[in-house]
Amino acid sequence: MKKILLLAALILMSQTVVFAQKEKSVKESDVPVRYVRDFNNQAKDAQNVAWTMSEDSSAYMATFTSPDGDKQAIRFTNKTSETRYYIDEQYYPHAIKDTVASQFPKHKITEIYIRNIKGKMTYQVRAARMSGFLFWKKEKDVKQISFETNSKLIEVIDEQ
């Protein structure tokens, strides 16, 4: 029994390493000062802040918990910043779930968040086909799908 639990834990850890390669965790002290200052101005009461950096160092993101317990993130680039408001699965908009189910029947929604860039709000959906068995699950054919706030489909991008 111990061997099975150890094997399951190793498999889960290896999957975490595989999926975490696109963004790298960084210390706040390694983030450009202007991004930290902007973050502190925008999210004064943020809790559990974790910073990540994109693989090519072009973007930094602070993921945090708001005072009311919601998961949020602010992503900074040289050109702009965007705020992400993550939505719990139980609150996914029905129209978006229906569109994804009809246009991508083999895909499962893995994440939905509202993206705010300079006051323009959109829903961002990440959907993937899952393959594997039991604990050994792998995402395939990942799609980033954008919707207007009225749930109208804007675009679909295949994730690399």
Model-derived features: positions:
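Bacterial Sec-dependent N-terminal signal peptides
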Residues: 1-26
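Interaction-mediating elements
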Residues: 21-160
